[in-house]
């Protein structure tokens, strides 16, 4: 007997592995730059350049890009000035996989977990970093669901059940290039040379449209520069500017549930002349690596059972796993803490604050998913001390929050939570203490897998050596309260419709309903009708 089948497409993670690598190297200061007096700030970013797969091994080619700002002596008046130094460190790492990744979609995410840059002497620095490499191997799995039979003249009785599930209709990676320009306001001097920049992506919103994935957000831009005037004073400016972008997505569904992750893989900040020819414009160009997924909630009828009165039907069933969406939201968590300033620091003004979120653990509790982590904050300041005019403080502010879930099985759920800094503020409570306030966004999606038994194949044969004339055409039956309409109809070679026609007490029951205990029924065998 030929069955009708419909396919459901699922993206399945075959295997994943996370490994940590340690990078360590020394770098010399260029001859054109002054000696290092004190390292004030540091910045780093780990980028994956390519992934090569050989069966159960993945070779990761990547680069650690870093920069430091230090204070050095000016050649003219011997005063301390901020100086920037950039560098990069390439790495090649083999990651073992628990599956054969040949032919699979293999992706790698690099996360800089720790960066330590120290001066060995006034002309050399030591760079040490810990980078976490997470390799994920995915494949498309086609799940076949039987929905009926092809034989139109077959008098088969079908038990169809509705079920709801979610399937991924988009699973792709692409780059989003952001180009924005900010201008130094009136009252600030023209830019002579750019010393330092910090660019943070915040408040990112994504949604599927008919044109593709629409992305919007804010760029928080901070610059420090040497003024283009006789005094050559150090100046800084911080602002936010909105950005938008569109990524082409084949088969984009505006009603789809999008879940998008992003990671900065390239940053370029340049000073450009404005319309008057003065260096007052700053061009910011970022490249975001976008991990784009979109899900569709579906409802479908599946054939769970079948029989033909008067025939023996051999059914082969198969268990398939699907998943349903439990929650998709963006939780907010407020974090605050006080940072102690050492007594020897004559703090005069906070210049800039940057932060990132580090998650330490997830735990399923009755209320939902408990998240424990910390906000790693760096506060850049200036002092009233001419011998040490600027510096920065690193601090860790722990937090605990809960993503609420209702009626879930903690042993089954699959979830992804992407944390990011949405708001950050640092203010001086006193010369000895800085108050830090942050708002963390926890972009969350959670699924619960479930199994369904579907008919894969069936074979029917007419019963032989059965004398139907010797069998009663009608049977009296008293329900025990354990069987459904379908169970009884299948056992006694009748149909649910025929049972409802002959018995008014069950006219409102469907085939999958249990017949109440004590209900008296008259069953007419269809094979004898």
Feature names for model-found ranges:
Residues 462-501, 505-529:
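Primarily a LysM-type cell-wall glycan-binding module
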Residues 1-471:
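Membrane-lipid interaction segments
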């Amino acid at each position: 007997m030929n069955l009708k089948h419909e396919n459901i497409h699922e993206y399945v993670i075959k295997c994943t592995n996370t490994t940590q690598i340690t990078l360590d190297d020394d770098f010399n200061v260029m001859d054109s730059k002054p000696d290092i007096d004190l390292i004030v700030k540091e910045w780093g970013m780990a980028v994956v350049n390519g992934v090569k797969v050989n069966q159960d091994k993945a070779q990761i080619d990547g680069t650690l890009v870093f920069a430091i700002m230090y204070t050095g002596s000016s050649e003219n008046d011997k005063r301390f000035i901020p100086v920037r130094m950039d560098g990069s460190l390439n790495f090649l790492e083999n990651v073992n996989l628990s599956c054969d990744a040949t032919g699979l979609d293999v992706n790698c995410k690099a996360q800089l977990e720790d960066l330590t840059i120290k001066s060995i002497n006034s002309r050399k620095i030591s760079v040490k970093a810990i980078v976490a490499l997470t390799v994920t191997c995915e494949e498309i799995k086609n799940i076949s669901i039987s929905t009926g039979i092809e034989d139109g003249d077959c008098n088969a009785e079908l038990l169809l059940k509705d079920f709801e599930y979610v399937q991924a209709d988009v699973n792709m990676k692409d780059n989003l290039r952001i180009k924005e320009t900010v201008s130094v306001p009136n009252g600030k001097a023209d830019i002579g040379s750019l010393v330092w920049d910090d660019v943070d992506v915040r408040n990112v919103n994504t949604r599927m449209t008919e044109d593709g994935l629409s992305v919007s957000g804010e760029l928080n831009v901070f610059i420090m520069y040497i003024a283009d005037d006789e005094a050559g004073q150090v100046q800084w400016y911080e602002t936010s500017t909105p950005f938008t972008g569109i990524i082409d997505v084949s088969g984009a569904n505006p009603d789809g549930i999008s879940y998008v992750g992003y990671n900065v893989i390239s940053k370029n900040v340049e000073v450009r002349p404005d319309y008057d020819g003065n260096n007052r414009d700053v061009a910011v160009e970022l490249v975001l690596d976008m991990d784009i997924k979109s899900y569709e909630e579906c409802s479908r009828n599946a054939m769970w059972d079948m029989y033909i009165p008067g025939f023996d039907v051999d059914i082969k069933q198969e268990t398939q796993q699907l998943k349903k969406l439990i929650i998709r939201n963006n939780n907010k968590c407020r974090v605050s803490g006080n940072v102690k300033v050492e007594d020897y620091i004559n703090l005069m003004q906070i210049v800039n604050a940057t932060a990132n979120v580090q998650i330490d653990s997830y735990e399923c509790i009755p209320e939902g998913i408990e998240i424990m982590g910390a906000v790693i904050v760096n506060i850049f300041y200036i002092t009233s001390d001419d011998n040490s005019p600027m510096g920065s403080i690193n601090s860790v502010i722990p937090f605990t929050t809960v993503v609420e879930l209702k009626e879930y099985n903690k042993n089954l759920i699959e979830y992804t939570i992407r944390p990011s800094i949405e708001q950050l503020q640092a203010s001086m409570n006193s010369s000895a203490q800085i108050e830090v306030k942050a708002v963390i966004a926890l972009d969350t999606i959670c699924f619960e897998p479930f199994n369904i038994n579907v008919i894969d194949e069936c074979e029917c044969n007419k019963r032989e050596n059965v004398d139907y004339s010797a069998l009663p055409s009608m049977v009296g039956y008293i329900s025990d309260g354990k069987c459904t309409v379908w169970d009884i109809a299948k056992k006694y070679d009748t149909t649910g419709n025929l049972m409802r026609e002959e018995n008014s007490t069950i006219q409102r029951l469907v085939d999958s309903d249990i017949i109440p205990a004590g209900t008296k029924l008259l069953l007419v065998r269809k094979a004898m009708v």
